[in-house]
Swiss-Prot record:
Biased composition (Polar residues): 307-319, 337-348
Domain of life: Eukaryota
Protein name (record): Autophagy-related protein 18
Taxonomic source organism: Pyricularia oryzae (strain 70-15 / ATCC MYA-4617 / FGSC 8958) (Rice blast fungus)
Keyword Membrane: yes
């Protein structure tokens, strides 16, 4: 019998379980110790999501059809059909969010009643995050961009144009899933978003744009920028971001073979201001006179700016400008400004290498925010090198999600931190599950301690463990 094709990989909300959707059903594993606790041959499962470690799972077996199933009882709780393909499912103990390309359906998970339908800009990558927390129950997604042109000149028989168009900037809308109101807009990046993640307590939001060089962390819902990290110099597509349960580390995987681990906060665990300059992560304080919570909108939500220059428009630069001062091809400054910016950034870079972090933090606190971010770019605290697969990776399932690799594409990965030890778990699109140890004192390169396959046909990973009631 041929090996099943891998369609979907996801960790549950506390990283204690791993759910895998394949062309021949789905499997659920414990992550510590690694063991298979449930398997089903329900058909071609393109999406699967768990509700913590309970027996409740959400399944997509056909593009527009969602099934909520109790795996312990082997029963279907409910079935829902949508007007277009379901691209993602998010859930916590109070809410279920179903993401379509241009809509998000929000349900009360207690009785599966529809609470709200959110119109969005075209979102083919299903960029959406729902807080695992029931208390801070926030939904984050790209801010819809209204269409500016009107239908006045269109023929009367022509279908109406969509209300929203694809985003051109990386603004994030924060939606309270309990009160069903939009509460803030975080202007996170100049270019469109590629990945967002919310921590377990629903208090932090990590964002990455299509450029993928800068990772930012904001408070939720106020939108204060706390950390800004540099993933790398060259553009890269971010596949996965995940906080550990204590929100002290952030893991990021991308098209490169490197998983980056960033440290959030120092001894004071992320206090803002100059005190954070000595930590591994760059803590960004508000500039004098800057309202860190954003000015409230009169109609629907407040808005928090997070671009490095308060008078720059969202589309006027790239991620490279945000931290290194380098011009983007679309928006190059004058030659004089380019020389001045480059020489000044070089001076700062050399100075920061000579002076200690404490001195840099003190001097940086007197500089404008843009210069402060140039002063001390925050790199990763630790990193992991994913082994290159020698097996050919083919995309044989036409109904599979875009998270799978096709021939010639780089290996894709999903990452999470262990809840009980300083270990990073990495699952790759060729069916490998890796566990790496991280030195929490010195950081540096993590080392591989365990490796498993999630596509094997044998039962050596079977376990008698059961779910929560």
């Amino acid at each position: 019998m041929a090996t099943a094709t891998l369609n979907f990989i996801t960790f549950n909300q506390d990283h204690g379980c791993l759910a895998v959707g394949t062309s021949r059903g789905f499997r659920i594993y414990h992550t510590e110790p690694f063991s298979k606790i449930f398997s089903s041959e329900d058909g071609n499962v393109s999406i699967i999501e768990m509700l913590f470690s309970t027996s409740l799972v959400a399944l997509i077996l056909s593009p527009r059809h969602l099934i909520i199933q109790n795996t312990k009882r082997g029963s279907v709780i409910c079935e829902l059909t949508f007007p277009s393909a379901v691209l993602a499912v998010r859930l916590n103990r109070k809410r279920l969010a179903v993401v379509l390309e241009d809509e998000i359906y929000l349900y009360d998970i207690a009785n599966m009643s529809l609470l709200f339908t959110i119109a969005t800009s075209p979102n083919p990558s299903a960029i959406c995050a729902l807080s695992p927390s029931s208390e801070n129950c926030f939904l984050a997604y790209p801010l819809p961009k209204p269409r500016e042109d009107k239908d006045d000149k269109r023929p009367s028989h022509a279908p109406p144009l969509p209300t929203y168009i694809p985003p051109t900037s990386g603004d994030v809308l924060i939606f309270d899933a309990i009160t069903l109101k939009a509460v803030n807009v975080i202007e996170a990046h100049r270019s469109p978003l590629s990945c967002i993640a919310i921590n377990s307590e629903g208090t932090l939001l990590a964002t990455a744009s299509e450029t993928g060089t800068i990772i930012r962390v904001f408070t939720v819902p106020k939108g204060q920028k706390l950390y800004q990290f540099r993933r790398g110099t060259y553009p890269s597509t971010i596949y996965s971001m995940s906080f550990n349960l204590s929100s002290t580390l952030l893991c990021v995987s991308s098209t490169s073979d490197t998983v980056h681990i960033f440290r959030l906060g120092g001894p004071n665990n992320g206090a803002s201001g100059a005190a954070g300059a000595g930590s591994a992560g760059e803590v960004l304080a508000a500039s004098p006179g800057q309202d860190i919570t954003g000015s409230p909108r009169a109609d629907r939500w407040s808005r928090s700016r997070s671009y490095d220059s308060g008078n720059e428009s969202p589309g006027s630069g790239s991620e490279a400008n945000d931290i290194a001062g380098s011009p983007s091809p679309r928006d190059r400054p004058t030659a004089a400004n380019r020389r001045q910016s480059g020489s000044f950034s070089n001076i700062l870079r050399r100075s920061s290498q000579i002076m200690g972090r404490s001195v840099a933090g003190v001097v940086g606190s007197y500089l404008p925010q843009t210069v402060t971010e140039m002063w001390e770019p925050a790199r990763d605290f630790a990193f992991i090198k994913i082994p290159k697969s020698s097996a050919a990776r083919q995309h044989n399932n036409p109904g599979a999600t875009p998270s799978l690799p096709i021939a010639g594409e780089p290996l894709r990965s999903v990452v999470a931190m262990s809840s009980s030890s300083p270990q990073v778990m990495v699952v790759t699109s060729d069916g490998k599950f890796y566990v790496y140890n991280i030195n929490m004192e010195t950081g540096g390169e993590g080392y591989l301690v365990r490796q498993y396959s999630i596509l094997e046909n044998d039962d050596k990973h079977d376990s008698s463990s059961t779910y929560e009631s």
